[in-house]
Amino acid sequence: MHACIRAVRFAFLPVLLFSVTALSAQQPGQLPTPKEGDYVSHDFHFKSGETLPELRMHYATFGTPVRDANGRVTNAVLLLHGTTGSGGQFLAPQFASVLFGRGQLLDVTRYYVILADNIGHGKSSKPSDGMHAHFPQYDYDDMVRSQHELLEKGLGVNHLRLILGTSMGCMHSWVWGETYPNFMDALMPLACQPVQIAGRNRVWRKMVIDGVRDDSDWKNGEYTAQPRAALSIAAAMFYVAGSAPLQIQKSLPTRDAADAASEDYVKRFVASHDANDLLYAVNASRNYDPSPQLEKISVPVMFVNSADDFINPPELGIAEREIQRVNKGRLVLIPISEQTHGHGTHTWAAVWQQYLKELLEASQH
């Protein structure tokens, strides 16, 4: 049964948000240290036809897997990050403080929580390791297949209680639901659309891609110094795409404040990104399109977007249309408020944790 709802703005939400945040403010310091490791896939074949002799997948985990009488893992949760991010994004207080503590929804003493760095991201294999523009042209299907291999062969996980993905990870969630429909109990995609990337969403990505390729300092990927002009263009695109007008206006109320913040953001972005890694990460979405096979998804889906998301504007009506094709799908559109953060609302768990709770309850066996 599918449903589409628009979350109402409760009068007590600010109080509730404060209570949750205050209650768990010290949780990150109390969490156990995650176990980090690397799984190496040998002769990994990409959809492009290319092969990588060794594909390194970095991961971090909390907790211990629990198995039923048949050896099936019952408590594993896979968290999937966004473009240019890493599994470490889920250690941010606005996520970990709300979900990982004792008695919270993803209590790491109960769940086996897996934070994986995707191909091209974090500490996993990526162009900047040395192959530069000769690195295989990976896409989202390759990334999901490598996640599946990491789980089964690297961690011995044969089933997931939940996949929760944000932004790019949101899109990966749809691919998971179609490619491995029986591997998980539930899906929670946050901040994306289950269709081909087109319109404004494709335009800004194309501008980032062309900005890198057209920069003479990129040198076909064999640069010795980062192409600063290309990265500055990318910084501008990423800032606008991820921005939340209400939050920015509040924090940058004057022209001087806005100018200073802009300069600081570009400086930090350029210093922390590699042009090839960025190009590959953005270009990986080039053939993403789960829409033809949405009916294959058989598990409960809690699909959450926010009304102030520049990348996925609600006025397009795409989410409302496509969720009707998901048998157990439900759409929640979170209205703009003091608590939303544009596209980045996906990591502010206090805003949407009530829907995670409902999903976990609805998908219990």
Please annotate each region the language model reported:
Residues N158-G199:
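Conserved hydrolase catalytic core segment
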Residues F183-R268:
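Alpha/beta-hydrolase-fold enzymes
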Residues K328-H365:
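Catalytic active-site module of serine/aspartate enzymes centered on a nucleophile-bearing elbow/loop
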